[in-house]
């Protein structure tokens, strides 16, 4: 008998750290967690701090915190002042010079929440990639989550980078998001943009597919028992399926004349439709960022002002957008001190 005596191979610090990060625990950490957890903690902490204590009086001329009497709908972490341009507004930067109160007054919390929020969303998507690889499944969950990631990046980073300053990005609040939507309609005619139309079709189509799918599966569950509650009609660990794909196929074949023939096509379609419903408007927002004038009538209005022979249809859509611009220019950008004479204010045909 031969006995070999030797040293166990030395493990480097990287291997030790890799094992610790990927250890099976209640809340998985992983390499993605090094990005996700700190940035998500700071983004949420910044948002709760801003909505609770920080005013928007110096940036937007409004109250925006619970301390000032706002509620959940009206509280927000507002964008920085227009004069700040695209500065990162670092706490130690030339604007705030290390003064935390001054930093909050200038809107530094918005850039803090936006940048940390962006990295936390990317970290969450990477987390889904990492866990999918470890458990041996395909990474389509991460692919689906790319939808919210690109929507966030398009609205909160790319759009204001194409505009004059961070001021024109959405603030982090409920009413603030609706203000941003109104702004997109009035200044970009967003609802006429085909990328917005594709987004509506994708999101509403995805919701419809989700409802139809859930109802169809419930309708075709095998009746494994006499219990009225469907959850008591099957064993969560059973090998066989609990519903009939054949029956579902027969039902929809009778309804539409066509039906999905297998679950792969069905579930790929349920993945594709809503994800495209998030990617397409994100592409459209990039177009708005650089002020593409294809669908907003402004180019027609400019030509009509220069060329008396050029005719345009003055529709209710144009009236709506002019009204939004006349209202929001004054109320939304008080630092510009806009004053519009009566003769340029939009009026309907009845006035």
Swiss-Prot record:
Database matches in Pfam families: Photo_RC
GO BP annotations, alphabetical order: photosynthetic electron transport in photosystem II
One of the record's GO cellular component terms: plasma membrane-derived thylakoid membrane
Annotated chlorophyll a PD2 binding sites: 196
Coiled-coil stretches noted in the UniProt entry, renumbered to this chain: none
Positions annotated to bind pheophytin a: 128, 141
Miscellaneous note of the record: 2 of the reaction center chlorophylls (ChlD1 and ChlD2) are entirely coordinated by water.
Classification via PANTHER family: PHOTOSYSTEM II D2 PROTEIN, PHOTOSYSTEM II PROTEIN D1
HAMAP family in alphabetical order: PSII_PsbD_D2
Protein name, as recorded: Photosystem II D2 protein
